[in-house]
Amino acid sequence: MYAIIQTGGKQYKVAEGDKIFVEKLNAEPGSIVTINEVLAVVKDGSIKAGNPYVEGAKVNLKVVRHGKGRKIIVFKYKPKKNYRRKYGHRQPFTEVIVEKIEA
């Protein structure tokens, strides 16, 4: 059994026990987060597709930790004008484990 969920503007294919990295969630590590935005559920070969979401379906995620991704360097440069700008960005994420899929 697996489900396709939407969180943080992205879609993820998840099964029970999966560990995934999602966009940062406002939840403490160790807490349970319920995702109601379930786009599809596949169980024993039968597919339930939502329009846009499957009614009554939800996925429980356990928050493991928060962190930051690897650093991305952005460098702007204009030749002959002595214009240089360098800055970095680290995208925050939340690591979660899929506890239960209810459909």
Curated annotation (Swiss-Prot):
GO CC annotations, alphabetized: cytoplasm; ribonucleoprotein complex; ribosome
Keyword rRNA-binding carried by entry: yes
Entry-linked Pfam families: Ribosomal_L21p (PF00829)
A GO BP entry: translation
One GO MF term: rRNA binding
Superkingdom of origin: Bacteria
Family, similarity comment: Belongs to the bacterial ribosomal protein bL21 family.
Function: This protein binds to 23S rRNA in the presence of protein L20.
Subunit and partners: Part of the 50S ribosomal subunit. Contacts protein L20.
Name of the protein this chain belongs to: Large ribosomal subunit protein bL21
Species this protein is from: Carboxydothermus hydrogenoformans (strain ATCC BAA-161 / DSM 6008 / Z-2901)
Lineage, highest ranks first: Bacteria, Bacillati, Bacillota, Clostridia, Thermoanaerobacterales
